[in-house]
Amino acid sequence: MAVIKSKTHSLPTVHVSSLLFICALFPALLFKGPQIEFFAVTQILLVMWLGWVVLQSHGSGLSVPKTALALCLTLFWLWLAISLSWSLAPSISVINFWWVGSLVLVFWLYTLTPDRDALWSHAAAIILVLGIVLALMGIYQVLVLEQQARSVFETRNTHAAFLNLVALPASAYFLLLMADKGAPRHFPGLLGVVLYILFFAIFMTASRGATLSLFLSMSVLVALSMRYLPKRGVVVLLLLMAAAFLSTEISHGELGERLPQLAQDSARRVIWESSWNLLKASPWQGIGLGLFYLAYPPYRNPVDNSGGFFAHNDYLQIWIETGLPGLLLLLAVLFAALWLLVRTLSVKTMSKSTRIELTGLFCGLLAVAGQSFVDFNLYILSIMMISGLVMGRFHQLANRELKTASMRIRFSRLIGKQAFPVIVVLLLLLPAMYFVSLGLANSYYDKALVQAREGKVQEADKSLATAERLTPADDRMLIAHADLYRHAITLLPPDAEGSKKLLYEDALKFLDQAQHVNSLRGLTFVIRGRLYQQNPALAGDNGHELATDSFRRALALNPKLFQGRTDYAAIVLQRGKKDEALQILDEGLKYEYYNMSDLIPFYSLAAKLRRELGREEDAKTLEDKVQYLEKQAAASYYLRGY
């Protein structure tokens, strides 16, 4: 009876924890940056998981392991929190604290959950099914839609990294099934088919970093497992991988073309060189977590045609954003995991199944860490969550073999049973309410943008006001509100001087607030410059100088702001300085831009000035681009089948 009670007591925790993790993972897969609502839902569910685990621990307490890996992870997360104090845009850094810190949060949630074996079996099975679904999506995108394989991710590289994290632990379980004579015969066959699909999908992405990480990690898995398993299982696993690679070459062939070009990857080299120049500006304490994309533009090489959001090297980017201590602590986490593996594998009494599973989990983490030298896995929420879970399982197995000491925190000695749930709920309400506000504010912000496009100025004004009340430190809302008021001034009749002045002053207040909470956003100064430029009577005698200075500051922060550059050139042109105006435009023309109709005024003005100043061939090049964009805009048609 005592045993039955013990098991029954642990079951609700396991079921709830598994459910909350999986429910949190699904919106995380859809979060790519702007979709803050998905991020908020994920974090709320993780906070609920934390609350559930803590609430169950009043009598038994929480067992905190005393290991180097747990310590390094905690110190890394603590440093991320400390770095918020000097961030140049704290509201963005706080979001990234939870974003990047999901690795540590999920690790601790797994570690503190009572029955971790059951939690792992539930979560791992669903993650494997999810991996198959995403793999099939990627294959469909390539073979049928003739697109890059990326499933729900923004890039094929992150899609491949996610599949690597699933495939390598699954490979370890496949080896165990092949060696287990008591396992049903169809189990190894089914898992073998799953692995073939995963490998095929990874190779189909033609991601060089993911492919090399897979090869490296698989080599480690095979090397460390060969002595303890029948060779038949290892050979079958390698044949599955080779068959998937050959199938990819026959059906697609892009990976074979891209792999030899790895040493000539000039695109990433350009990004790394520019990022290194940014690093030298603040190497010790960093610029603030999540602010790379805002600080990068002034250092950006014009030939860099990337989105500019990431350094494509997590270790370099975390150094830039959190300083040298952040990098050292991240590396300490990796070395602590490696040292834990070495120590555990030296235990001679360890079972074969634990040894192979432990190695497979480590190899999954190794693949993610290896690819992070050329990518940005640390900033992919779903990958960080699964990495935290895998690291938690790896840590659990190692501790079980090493019998490491732990510290038990007993809340019952400090807080009564009735007061405990009230205190826990109140404490967790703080982050939960923050995430609710974050998600709602972004929804109102998106709603305001739609309303503004539809000409509903008053409705957009109300939506932005609500968003600002929810997140007062988000500069996006403030900039959008200022721009809305700038536009509203143009809609008023000429004799409405009083209303224009009120809107003008309020717009300046919004811009002042935006500049205060985020000094890196160049768009703030573009809107300010336009406000001065369009309202000379309200700007005063020095309005022209104010507008000019605003545009200069905008371009100093982000030289690719071509709309602000066009406005700046127009001001200079009004004074008859064609050479200077063209020079301003030419500076912007050094950069690569995605084709969009918004570029037409920029290219048209530059082409006009080039022709007037005798640069006929250069003008013709831009005129051809304008014609192409105009033709593309005119030809755009949204089909409807209903």
Predicted regions and their residues:
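Alpha-helical transmembrane segments of multi-pass inner-membrane proteins
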Residues: 2-32, 43-54, 75-84, 95-252, ...
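Flexible juxtamembrane loops connecting transmembrane helices in multi-pass membrane enzymes
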Residues: 148-149, 214-218, 241-280, 297-298, ...
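Internal/C-terminal transmembrane anchor helices
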Residues: 234-249, 410-440
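TM-adjacent membrane-interface loops and short helices in multi-pass inner/ER membrane proteins
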Residues: 269-309, 315-318, 322-329
